[in-house]
């Protein structure tokens, strides 16, 4: 049995206290605790505590320390329950203490996966124009439950998905001006798949793109690639030249009619 002889505020940290005890051989330093632990255990001068109680105090001190670490981690941005658990494990906090800390954080509403998922969907759809499947995968990696993700994605209606997908198309299609319409369409489709949009949404956007097809741009692209391949293959004669030109331009996404029209033009020029 020991008796608390003195409680002293630490000089550098006003919320921490040094506890001095007497085990029958005079006053000695016992341990230090956070203010929350001091209050929880009602520590005061003259209080008698045994080894079991001291062990309990020190355990709660570790819990409080981990709790404050988690609060600091959460102060920068919202986190999921799994992210906080992983952070504490990296800090070499024991699983029993992590469980207690998570329970307290949930109770105090410092972590809430439902609120996190809704905010994440809004941010990723409005700011980064990501598609639903990519957002779903990212939330799953963060440990959010499938049912919560499905509910949160209701914040991302199909109309908004189409708007975002078409916005991405408008930004990207400028870089494909020297490609055939078919090749540009394929590249844009691949980009939207990577961004997480459904086939249905992509099809709607590509149909709109088809209606906006600029024949003059298609012709420019045909002339650009056609003249490039013409210089490359003009050393060949007859069928070999024609076959190589057709294969090269067809791979670039031009139709047979477009290719034959170009070859006819070059023939008339030549």
Curated annotation (Swiss-Prot):
It is found in: Cytoplasm. Its main location: cytoplasm. It holds the Pfam family RecX_HTH3. This is Regulatory protein RecX. Keywords: Cytoplasm. InterPro entries: RecX_HTH_1st, RecX_HTH_2nd, RecX_HTH_3rd, Regulatory_RecX, WH-like_DNA-bd_sf. NCBIfam families: PRK14135.1.
């Amino acid at each position: 049995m020991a008796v608390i002889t003195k409680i002293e505020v630490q000089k550098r940290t006003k919320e921490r206290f040094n506890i001095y005890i007497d085990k029958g051989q005079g006053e000695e330093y016992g341990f230090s605790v956070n203010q929350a632990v001091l209050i929880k255990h009602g520590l005061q001068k003259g209080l008698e505590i045994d080894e079991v109680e001291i062990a309990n105090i020190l355990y709660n001190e570790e819990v409080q320390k981990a709790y404050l670490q988690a609060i600091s981690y959460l102060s920068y941005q919202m986190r999921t329950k799994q992210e906080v658990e992983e952070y504490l494990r990296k800090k070499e906090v024991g699983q029993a203490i992590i469980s207690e800390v998570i329970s307290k954080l949930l109770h105090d509403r410092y972590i809430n996966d439902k609120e996190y998922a809704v905010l994440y969907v809004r941010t990723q759809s409005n700011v980064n124009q990501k598609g639903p499947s990519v957002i779903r995968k990212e939330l799953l990696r963060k440990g959010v439950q499938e049912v919560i993700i499905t509910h949160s994605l209701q914040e991302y209606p199909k109309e908004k998905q189409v708007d975002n997908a078409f916005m991405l198309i408008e930004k990207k299609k400028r870089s494909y001006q020297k490609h055939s319409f078919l090749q540009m369409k394929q590249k844009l489709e691949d980009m939207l798949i990577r961004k997480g949009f459904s086939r249905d949404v992509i099809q709607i956007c590509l149909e709109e793109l088809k209606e906006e097809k600029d024949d003059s741009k298609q012709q420019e692209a045909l002339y650009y690639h056609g003249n490039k391949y013409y210089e490359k293959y003009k050393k060949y004669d007859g069928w070999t030249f024609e076959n190589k030109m057709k294969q090269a331009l067809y791979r670039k996404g031009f139709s047979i009619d477009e290719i034959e029209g170009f070859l006819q033009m070059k023939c008339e020029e030549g």
